[in-house]
Amino acid sequence: MTKAQFKSGLFAFMKYLPFGKAILKALYLRNFPSLQKNVLGLRFSNPIGVGSGLDKTGSFYDEIAAIGPSFVEIGPLRDVHTAIATLQAEPKDCVVFADLSNSGNIERGFSLIYDFVDAVVFNASSNTNVLATMDRIITLRRYNDVYKPIIIKLFPDLKDEQYKEAADYILRNGIDAVEVIPTKVGLMLELTHNLVPVISYGRFSSYEEVAQTLDDGAQLVALSYLPVKDGFHYINGLLQKLSKK
């Protein structure tokens, strides 16, 4: 069993444990009013979220939210139906992004889950042509009464000229936000002329790394990794330090 599977298993266990979510909230969920912010037309209780990879089915995002993140990125979803069933049955305790990059039919997955999440994420790497698909996704969004943000996540295997191409596409087509690794935050802000919110994602192992990427201009931080040694307290510890900055 990998560390990621172990952590996912812990949250799944807390979902089915009687009062599991309530226990997590009582132990780890704290309010930091000074960290609240509005991004993408959405209200975030703080800038820290959990990126895709931990809740790959959209089954226990509320249990993850109970330890402090303001948003959870579910997926990459292979099948949106499990996530939709959970989203229909349980009120969301946080902002929920859906990563549809592993969905067999991205356009169908987008249409099905659109009404149930707060934003949708698509991955762009050197071996995918996601921007071609995005034209159809943007068209589909126009048929919905409620506007939901679309986020493009740029993988680190892209070359700088591909970041430039992506930035041009984002500006030209009204993509709402972009996710990049910490070392590309400054580049993307420059390429988009500070017109598009940047979300920094990756394995942040310390408060200093999180604080630095926020200082570099990231609006939000999506943690791709929760250190096992710090347990459920990790995010709360980050928020306590950020609130004192």
Q: Which residue stretches match the model-derived regions?
A:
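Glycine-rich beta-to-alpha transition loops that act as phosphate-gripper elements at the mouths
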Residues: 52-55, 99-102, 154-160, 197-208
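Glycine-rich phosphate-binding active-site loops on the catalytic face of alpha/beta enzymes
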Residues: 72-79, 120, 124-126, 177-183, ...
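Structural preference for beta-strand elements that scaffold enzyme active sites
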Residues: 47-50, 71-73, 93-99, 118-121, ...
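N-terminal capping/small domains of soluble enzymes
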Residues: 1-104, 238
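Alpha-helix-loop-beta-strand connector modules within alpha/beta enzyme cores
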Residues: 80-94, 132-152, 156, 184-200, ...
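Acidic (Asp/Glu)-rich catalytic clusters
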Residues: 64-67, 84-93, 109-117, 137-145, ...
